[in-house]
Amino acid sequence: MSKKENNTCNTCMSDLTRRDFLKVSGAITGGLAAASAVSNTALASSGGGDIPLEDQKALFYDATYCVGCRECELACKEDNHLKEENVDDLSGNTFTLIKLYQSEDGGESSFRKYQCMHCVDPACATSCPVGALEKTDEGPVLYESLKCIGCRYCMQACPYGVPAYDWSQAYPLIAKCDLCYDRHDGPACATACSPGALISGTRGELLKIAKERIAANPGKYYEDRVFGEHDGGGTSVLILSAVSFDKIGLPPLTEKAIPHYGETATRAVPYIFGGAAGFTAIVYRATMTAEERQRLGKKQGKEEGETE
């Protein structure tokens, strides 16, 4: 455990009152049992509620149109007020990332946009013991930080390796793309994409566009199919590529919905926490009010400032 993690846990436990301790102690037994018995179907909405799948919000990425300009990355950071950083993977300040695949002989290459795939039946939501991740009726998979207990089951459950832990915060939480859920003009990345590699719309509309491109260009696209139409039960982010999907970082999935990926994570309870002591701190954090979290965060920030 890092020094920062130790400081966080120590501060949490030192602020416990007798009433808090009894509250936490009482929650441990029930919490361990409840988390271990999370249903694989109770927490995730598999069909997007009352809105038909074809009418839900989606994003289409055609890798053959992408020139690697990274306008999408910049737009995402600006719209979400994220810090600039030079990273090679998704993080608490990077929700989308353009990477380049190139074969060893240099004869084959392709760009690939990494981000949350917004699964039709998301394993991350199914694996979350407190319902901090939810598949909305409109399509995007959203994250509610106030519910999060920092267990990181979603990170284990996601077959795309998307959820990132934001260690820069006083309370490390999960961070990921929300498909610009509340943005009227659609995802910022798609709006900024001048080459036309990104298009936003309904899932039905985008599938039609993708299939029209396949039909108009026989042999151009890998397997003449759209990744995400059926893979892992389907996703709200649809992808076309000229090279095999595994070469651009997409996992080989069947058409079966993927919540079963969350089974491994939920079975790991409570060992991920390092035993009951670690779980105590996690449960305490989960039972804190927003005001308590803010107060402790300010205290921690002050202490860190004094040590610098």
Indicate residue ranges for each PLM-predicted region.
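Long, hydrophobic/aromatic-enriched structural stretches that serve as scaffold segments
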Residues: E104-S110, Y114-G131
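N-terminal secretory signal peptides and thylakoid transit peptides that target proteins
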Residues: N6-T29
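C-terminal segment of N-terminal export signals and the immediately downstream linker at the start
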Residues: D15, S36-R70, A286-E308
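Bacterial N-terminal signal peptides
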Residues: T29-A35
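Iron-sulfur cluster-binding cysteine motifs and their immediate structural context
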Residues: T41-A42, S46-G49, V67, E71-L90, ...
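Short, solvent-exposed interaction modules
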Residues: Y114, I174-A175
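Interfacial juxtamembrane loops and adjacent helix segments
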Residues: T94-S103
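Long, compositionally biased charged/polar accessory segments in the mid-to-C-terminal portions
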Residues: S200-G297
